[in-house]
């Protein structure tokens, strides 16, 4: 139902289909959305190339690194051509190199016109890529605004970020 409304979702925990290859993970969604086998193949090839995972096409999902797994999950999510994607803790459980890759992928999604909503405790990485931020405290909105507005807010620094917080 969510996908039919144009919403993609990537949970924090691994959502890859472990018993499938990389290409079969993506095809599992394409087959639901694209009736033409030739169009499925074209879209599969495009997604594999876009996310630099073509060389992993026949690899088992179990053999992937955290960053590779995340790229496959994002490619699979895009197979349904969502208008918006909710990313739950996209920076959790991945190595520092993969953090940069995920940041680049999120920027590319924004450039494609896909709305991206991120929930993450890794504020430093998240504030580097968002246009607007919303800081919640005890279930209430503490501050919303641009990353700079949020970082400079005294209450946010006192309650959540800490006085010495900076984005480097």
Summary of predicted features, one role per range:
Residues 27, 38-56, 104-107:
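Conserved ABC ATPase "signature" region
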Residues 60-64, 68:
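Conserved ABC ATPase signature
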Residues 74:
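Hydrophobic anchor residue at the start of the ABC signature
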Residues 81:
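Conserved catalytic motifs of ABC-family nucleotide-binding domains
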Residues 85-89:
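Catalytic Walker B motif of ABC-type/P-loop ATPase nucleotide-binding domains
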